[in-house]
Regions:
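Residue-level signal for nonpolar/aromatic packing positions in well-ordered secondary structure
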Residues: 22, 58, 71, 140, ...
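Short, solvent-exposed turn/loop segments enriched in Gly/Ser/Thr/Pro and often Arg
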Residues: 35, 158, 202-205
Length: 215
């Protein structure tokens, strides 16, 4: 079985997270681009790979993984165990896994709904399990303050790739407020050469020409 790494991605999408981590790892990989505008993630051949019709999807030989947190956890464990992925016995392992999953289970939905007035189906029936944006960001800032600017073990890990990519995009679109701590976090991460390369590939400026960056 070949262990070739293939990343199925789309331009101007959240595929940048997995691509950034691959660049951090320095492992060889091949990109397979699917055009979202042309519906190429919904064609039958791609749906056999990812039944949700989404990107990114990672294939390592016959092993297929989708959803950014799962991809990040797998890649870091497989290619950077003990470095970008804290070891199982490392106290940082818990925060590392928590923040990696939190990025899409809490931060993404909370920030996507911020500012939208969605009425409950019944009076008193208002509840979202992922929480409200302000306390989520408060917790993130507290973790960064206590962790020396990073989320696990006081050092850069794949958790920062996962969370940092979400924060970077949400700051750009204005879906989260530009708090100084978060802006500094993104500035620090975006200075990394792996981030720059991934962003150049997956977030080309022309694709965002219609988006007015948040002040």
């Amino acid at each position: 079985m070949s262990d070739e790494i293939v990343l199925y991605r789309s331009v101007a999408s959240r595929s940048v997270t997995a691509l950034w981590l691959l660049e951090e790892l320095g492992v060889p990989y091949r990109l397979e681009t699917r055009d979202l505008k042309k519906g190429e993630t919904r064609d039958p051949a791609y749906l056999k790979i990812n039944p949700f019709g989404k990107v990114p999807t990672l294939a390592i030989g016959d092993q297929v993984t989708f959803e950014n947190p799962a991809i990040c956890l797998l890649l870091a464990d497989r290619y950077s165990y003990g470095a970008l992925a804290p070891k199982l016995e490392d106290p940082a392992r818990g925060p590392y896994m928590t923040w990696t999953v939190w990025a899409t289970s809490a931060l993404e939905p909370a920030s996507a709904l911020e500012g939208h007035d969605i009425p409950p189906k019944r009076p008193g029936d208002w509840h979202f399990g992922f929480g409200k944006l302000t306390p989520e960001l408060d917790a993130l800032e507290a973790a960064l303050a206590s962790g020396g600017g990073y989320l696990a073990g006081g050092r850069f890990t794949a958790a920062d790739v996962m969370v940092g990519s979400v924060v970077a995009l949400r700051l750009f679109t204005g879906q989260i407020p530009r708090r100084p701590t978060l802006a500094e976090y993104v500035d620090r991460l975006s200075a990394r050469s792996a981030f720059k390369h991934a962003a150049d590939i997956n977030w080309p400026p022309a694709e965002f020409a219609h988006v007015q960056p948040a002040p």
